Amino acid sequence: MFEEMMGTKPVSERQKFDVDALDGYLRAHIPDYPGGPLTVAQFKGGQSNPTFKISAGEQHYVLRTKPGPAAKLLPSAHAIDREFRVMDALHKAGFPAARQYTLCLDESVIGRAFYVMEFVEGRVLWDQSLPGMSAPERAAIYDELNRVIAQLHTVDYAAIGLADFGKPGNYFARQIERWTRQYQASATETIEAMDQLMAWLPKAIPPGDDTAIVHGDFRLDNMIFHPTEPRILAVLDWELSTLGHPAADFSYHCMSWHIPPGQFRGIAGLNLEEMGIPSQEAYIAAYCERTGKTIRIEDFNFYLAYNMFRLAGIMQGIMKRYVDGTASSAQALENGKAARPMAELGWTYAQRAISLLKDKQ
């Protein structure tokens, strides 16, 4: 699975760019850059911003760009400058994010905006059941995930220069409105569950507010682990990051406990205790202990419904790019088809929230 998703391939015709121009730019902007000949290979995984492994001699880097010139971009998508900014600030603050080298917003250099960061050697773990590991190894991996998301949500974002990285407060209302707009802009068919969620979610937001840096896609396969230790070296894919409610980010991360192994490699229905994987209740308790935050269990169905709505919106965006011919991965159609079942699962959790509310009345 690792080779299938994170191996490299020759750069596709649609994503080709002037390698010599890139080499010249890097010579001028990266200290100790060894210079060409520069070789470029495209990573197979990822649908949004094309990502490349670039090598100059024995030195390796990661190049991330906006999609090629033919791409039709949603208004707020592909903001690579934000990815660069948040990773740069977090890396300098001691959080496990890749070191950033240079950001170029001048599209005349290679035909699109791009940034370059370090290439981090390590493991990407795709299956959340962690096959082939012992129970203690699984427990250590999950504890490290919990530690790192708790670390992220307790970073003083203002102190590291990210006070204006998003709008503090009212996060759920703004995000529901945003993903409603983006879903409607990318719809290719009618999904009744999405219509129901778009109507219900704005009226069901739990009371209370909090603000932290939120990753937006904090899941196992967006981590690079140390080759042999249960230690996260770098958190990847910051394209959805902003200032937001940490409960939204954490509950998204907890969706694995509610998705069966056949869908997005979830862990619902597995014998977690035997496997060494914590229960959701224990995982939430560990997060709350590390952060000092409180998550009300009665609000969790809303959080799950919201995140499944949001994920369905992301999947629908991938489907739209597939239909338009601008998706940058062969996985696009498979992922796009997941929009409907994800929305339907989200509506199931919304109905649970509605039922619990009725029981309390």
List PLM regions with ranges:
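Helical subdomain adjoining the active site within ATP-dependent kinase catalytic cores
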Residues: 293-299, 310-361
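Activation of the activation-loop gatekeeper triad in protein kinase-fold domains
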Residues: 236-241
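ATP-binding pocket architecture of kinase catalytic cores
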Residues: 37-213, 226-230
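All-alpha amphipathic helical-bundle segments outside canonical DNA-binding/catalytic cores
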Residues: 166-167, 295-306
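Active-site activation/catalytic loop segments of kinase-like enzymes and analogous catalytic loops
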Residues: 248-292, 306-325
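Catalytic-loop of the protein kinase fold
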Residues: 213-215, 220
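Juxta-kinase regulatory segment immediately upstream of eukaryotic protein kinase catalytic domains
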Residues: 1-34
